[in-house]
């Protein structure tokens, strides 16, 4: 192993070369991995009583990283999923270390043997058709906000889109004038796919675009908040919770389920969820 191999050059080459150029990582992935490694380095610096810039690779050994992961769970109250996400970033970095400096393969290999922690399997809740219909019909169709909420809920139910995909749709991602309308969803990790949409959703989207004066070819968001800016994840969650509060009097079973935008992905059947991969986008 290279003696006293400083972390700084390896970290720089990792983000500049491996993630950006080789892996074409998304900004979200870059930010997540950067946060994980920053937290690890600060933990190591505190534990070893050294400045972060003075840390060397061999000090980030298996035992130190296991202690870091334990602290995430025990002191920071991170979930197992978050702990595993941090470990994924660390393992990615050490894969780069092994390739960039073969002399450090041993220390990298020992870190790479740290296993992903298995989480308890939680019960997946599903919505019935009656519950979904009650949620979609809950918003007031006589108000602009109500019409937007209805269309957004209908979009989630008919496409099975992730909330980030639904809020990220622009008018020019829609093809509503085709005999078989469809939408381009921009997924995680640059995985885009084309999803067919039914006629009821196509009509609702057409009406929403017309109400806001948005042309089909414009790269403008179709779902916007009170300030006419793209709907956020928080805003999407608020729409769903507001619909639940209104619909629960009709469908009391809704009160027994943890409902968020994600639950619409478990509304079965969803023949459109897989979609068609669009590698050229």
UniProtKB/Swiss-Prot annotation:
Keywords: DNA integration, DNA recombination, DNA-binding, Plasmid, Transposable element, Viral genome integration, Virus entry into host cell. Residues 5-98 form the Core-binding (CB) domain. PROSITE patterns: CB, TYR_RECOMBINASE. GO terms for molecular function: DNA binding. The keyword DNA-binding applies. The active site is at residues 162, 188, 262, 265. GO terms for biological process: DNA integration; DNA recombination; establishment of integrated proviral latency; symbiont entry into host cell; viral genome integration into host DNA. Residues 122-281 form the Tyr recombinase domain. Seems to be non-functional. Belongs to the 'phage' integrase family. This is Putative integrase/recombinase y4rD.
